[in-house]
Regions:
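Intrinsically disordered, low-complexity regions of eukaryotic proteins
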Residues: 22-24, 72, 84, 102, ...
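Hydrophobic residues in beta-strands and at strand termini
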Residues: 14-18, 71, 121
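Hydrophobic beta-strand-centered segment that forms part of the acyl-chain substrate-binding groove
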Residues: 43-95, 112-113
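HotDog/MaoC-like acyl-thioester-processing domains
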Residues: 2-12, 76-80, 88-147
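Residue-level recognition of specific faces of alpha-helices
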Residues: 32-35, 63, 118
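Catalytic strand-loop segment that frames the active site of acyl-thioester-processing enzymes
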Residues: 1-49
Length: 147
C-alpha cells in the first residue's frame, strides 16, 4: 500500500455499496468513475458553479477527453472512501483534475486509487473546442494544486 500523498483541496465521502461491487465483494473498477464524477461535480458546486448552471445558464460544456486510473488496493463493500480532487492544470481550453482515494475511518488511511481526468471546453452547437471562460478559471483557482 502506498502512503498518503498531500491532501487535495476538496473531498467527498462515498460508501462502497453492494451495487458497486463485483462477485468477490470488492469494488468494480467502473464504480470509481461515478465517484470521481461526484467529487468533480461537488467541487464545481463549492466553487459556485454547479454543473447544470454552467451548462444551461453559462453555456459551458466540458466533455471528457482523457481519463486514467491506477488502483493501489481493493476497496471492499461498506467501506467509507475519502474521494479527494484538485485542479492539476488549467489550460487554454481544458482542465485536468487529479483524484486520490483513501479508505476513511479507523487506523491509517489505505490508498485505494489515483486518477486524472481531462475535460475540454467546447461550443455547444459545433462541439469544437473553445477557450475556457475566465469566470471558470477564477472560480476554480482555490482548488488548484500547489497554488
Amino acid at each position: 500500500m502506498t502512503q498518503p500523498v498531500e491532501r487535495l483541496p476538496f473531498a467527498v465521502a462515498e460508501r462502497v455499496r453492494w451495487s458497486d461491487c463485483d462477485p468477490l465483494g470488492i469494488i468494480f473498477y467502473g464504480s470509481f468513475v461515478r465517484m470521481f464524477e461526484a467529487a468533480e461535480h461537488e467541487m464545481f458546486r463549492a466553487a459556485g458553479l454547479p454543473y447544470e448552471v454552467m451548462r444551461v445558464q453559462r453555456h459551458v460544456q466540458l466533455p471528457r477527453k482523457a481519463f486514467a486510473v491506477e488502483f493501489h488496493s481493493p476497496a471492499q463493500m461498506d467501506e467509507l472512501l475519502d474521494i479527494q480532487v484538485g485542479v492539476a492544470k488549467i489550460g487554454t481550453t481544458s482542465l485536468t483534475f487529479r483524484f486520490e482515494v483513501y479508505r476513511s475511518g479507523d487506523g491509517a488511511p489505505l490508498h485505494r486509487a489515483s486518477a486524472t481526468l481531462t475535460v475540454v471546453c467546447v461550443d455547444k452547437e459545433s462541439i469544437t473546442k473553445r477557450p475556457l471562460p475566465d469566470f471558470v478559471k477564477e472560480a476554480l483557482a482555490p482548488f488548484v494544486i500547489g497554488a
